[in-house]
Regions:
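Catalytic machinery of carbohydrate-active enzymes
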Residues: 1-342
Length: 342
């Protein structure tokens, strides 16, 4: 059996996972082989990476807190590493469980960030410092690979979408070449989500400019927001697609003329698929890691110049829903006019 390369990415946030995909591919390039990924199901990695040629297989682990969960997950990963003959394990995080499992499985090369108790189990000597945990995820991983003597020229990932799914979406949504705008109307942290009244005002402004089909995306628990927006506008060309999973959302994003939405995982996914995407950054600081992301910020500037969100005197995030109101509908509409092709 060929020895395998494992990458463990334990975070469950979609946007963070997409930010880390270039690093996962980089490990595949370093190793000159496909990799086996271990991550959380909430990343939707199996759907997102279905058409990528640097992935051999994907395993989901919940990475739950609690002593018994720790033991259960260590034993599961240890068996996985042993059964699939792991040659190397890369851990793109500071947690110890994968490193312990790899040690017990007698994996010779275990690379991780270090910093915490993980440093007792990994084999790489060049590790990150505690202060590195405060910098952005991308900068942190960039530093890690530089210290490992595997520098990366970081470029935002391009995700492939199955052609048959694209064709189905085109036929269903745009049989007569209708122009589509997709909206991400919620967020995993709703305090930083744009209010529905602003989405309504924006859609009405866009409708005055040209005819578009508007598709509203949200998590199923926030589907009611899409219904409320549709009820206010009463336009047959506005559709509630909040019931869809990532696999079905991806081709819709790809066939859209533009995506407009909150700073969220779907914004990153849309940009990675190749769609021009306006990100609404009222409660969070904008970023420029992708040419496809067009930041819409408040007239009075970024929420912060030093951190990605506003912090109080104790360093805790200020979760004030009013911060999202800083970006007005006209701020987003101006970005739309500047970047859409009529």
């Amino acid at each position: 059996m060929n020895q395998n390369i494992f990458v463990v990415y334990p975070s469950g946030k979609l946007g963070d996972f997409i930010w880390h995909m270039p690093f996962i591919r980089h490990i595949s390039n370093i190793s000159k082989r496909e990799i086996i990924l271990i991550t959380r199901e909430s990343t939707s990695a199996k759907a997102i990476l279905a058409d990528e040629n640097y992935i051999e297989d994907i395993y989901y682990i919940p990475f739950k807190k609690g002593f018994f969960n720790y033991i259960k997950e260590i034993l599961y990963m240890q068996k996985l590493f042993k059964t699939l003959d792991a040659k190397e394990v890369w851990i793109l995080d500071k947690i110890s469980r994968p490193a312990i499992a790899a040690r017990v499985a007698n994996v010779k090369t275990i690379n991780g960030f270090g910093v915490t108790n993980q440093s007792l189990w990994i084999t790489n000597k060049n590790q990150l410092e505690k202060k590195d945990l405060k910098i952005h995820y991308i900068e942190r991983s960039n530093k890690f690979f530089n210290q490992m003597n595997y520098p990366i020229n970081y470029k935002f990932i391009n995700i492939n979408v199955d052609e048959s799914l694209l064709e189905t979406s085109r036929n269903q949504l745009s049989p007569n070449n209708e122009k589509i705008i997709t909206y991400g109307i919620d967020s995993s942290e709703m305090w930083r989500s744009w209010p529905k009244e602003y989405f309504i005002e924006l859609i009405l402004k866009i409708n005055k400019k040209d005819n578009y089909k508007h598709i509203l995306l949200a998590s199923p628990k926030n589907a009611y927001l899409a219904d409320e927006i549709i009820n206010e506008i009463s336009d047959k060309n506005i559709l509630n697609y909040a019931h869809l999973g990532i696999k079905d959302i991806m081709p819709i994003l790809k066939v859209s003329s533009m995506y407009i939405g909150n700073d969220s995982g779907i914004l990153n996914l849309s940009a990675a698929i190749g769609t021009k995407s306006i990100g609404i950054f009222g409660a969070t600081k904008s970023f420029d890691y992708s040419d496809n992301i067009i930041p819409a910020i408040a007239k009075d500037g970024e929420i912060s110049t030093t951190t990605d969100r506003l912090l109080d005197n104790k360093g805790k995030t200020i979760e004030d829903p009013k911060l999202a109101y800083r970006v007005k509908p006209n701020d987003v509409f101006e970005k739309f006019i500047e970047n859409i092709l009529f």
